[in-house]
A protein has these predicted regions:
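Residue-level signal for well-ordered, solvent-exposed loop/turn and beta-edge residues enriched
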Residues: 128, 152, 170-171, 176
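Zn2+-dependent peptidoglycan hydrolase active-site motif and core
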Residues: 105-107, 116, 123-165, 184-198
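A generic structural motif
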Residues: 113, 146-148, 203-205
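Conserved beta-strand positions that form and line the central face of beta-propeller blades
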Residues: 111, 144, 157, 180, ...
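Alpha-helical oligomerization segments with coiled-coil/rod-like character
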Residues: 1-71
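Surface-exposed, glycine-biased beta-strand/turn segments
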Residues: 54-141, 174, 229-237
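Acidic, glycine-rich catalytic/binding loops that coordinate metals and/or anionic ligands
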Residues: 72-79, 84, 167-174, 180, ...
Length: 237
């Protein structure tokens, strides 16, 4: 079937990436999900969409758009900050002083700080929750949201959450509580954080399972202030 063929292709690609990542593990640590988590969640997604009515001859992306959020088309015309207030302490692809990277590595988002643990995090635009990961070793509790802003599909991700307040397929707005910012109390399982902050990332398309390859600097779309440690100020909704 088309779905099974897609899954096998993705699994082969992810397994190949796993070999490469393990070979270079001493050089960097990738923030987000592990390859094993991606494969596990993709299989669960196939089962979930099949149970909702996706047919064997349908593309995963097509039937996903059809059945996610109860056939409701979620659109938006603009973006909001994912926190009511905060500052930027780490740039997209920049070295992150709050995360443990052995020798560096890519940073596929920006870090929003100057807030305390437990601060409410919000979606950056109207959308639907596409994926949730709990207790990942490098990213902790994570939420992916699919958007369609001005006719363009996007994915946003929110990492290092203390708690998650939404569920997969839930329709959200910029006023919906996604969860709470994590911090020192999440370090027991999240090896990539040393303090309270929200990692916020953006990518083109609906790519909860291939996010980093399609990611871009959130500053390209949302007007965040300069780095706090370089004299930048605060943002607020």
């Amino acid at each position: 079937s088309t779905k099974r063929s897609n899954l096998e292709t993705e699994s082969n690609s992810l397994n190949s990436k796993l070999i490469t990542l393990r070979a270079n593990l001493s050089n960097y640590k990738e923030e987000g999900t592990t390859i094993e988590e991606d494969i596990r969640d993709m299989k669960a997604e196939i089962s979930r969409l099949t149970a909702k009515g996706c047919k064997n001859n349908e593309e995963i992306s097509t039937c996903g758009r059809k059945y996610n959020s109860g056939n409701v088309t979620i659109t938006a015309t603009g973006w909001s900050y994912p926190l009511n207030w905060g500052c930027v302490t780490s740039e997209y692809t920049g070295y992150n002083i709050r995360e443990d990277w052995s020798g560096g590595g890519g940073h596929h988002g920006i870090d929003l700080d100057c807030v305390s643990e437990g601060t409410t995090a919000y979606p950056a635009a109207n959308g639907v929750v596409a994926r949730i990961v709990n207790y990942s070793s490098c990213g902790g509790n994570q939420v992916w949201v699919y958007h369609n802003v001005n006719g363009i599909p996007y994915t946003t991700v929110y990492l290092h959450l203390l708690r998650i307040s939404v569920s997969v397929d839930q329709v959200v707005t910029p006023q919906t509580k996604i969860g709470e910012v994590g911090g020192y109390s999440t370090q027991s399982y999240d090896n990539c954080t040393t303090g309270a902050h929200l990692h916020f990332g953006m990518a083109y398309g609906h790519n909860a399972y291939n996010f980093n390859a399609n990611s871009f600097n959130p500053r390209n779309i949302i007007n965040f202030p300069a780095l706090y440690y370089s004299g930048g100020g605060y943002f607020s909704r």
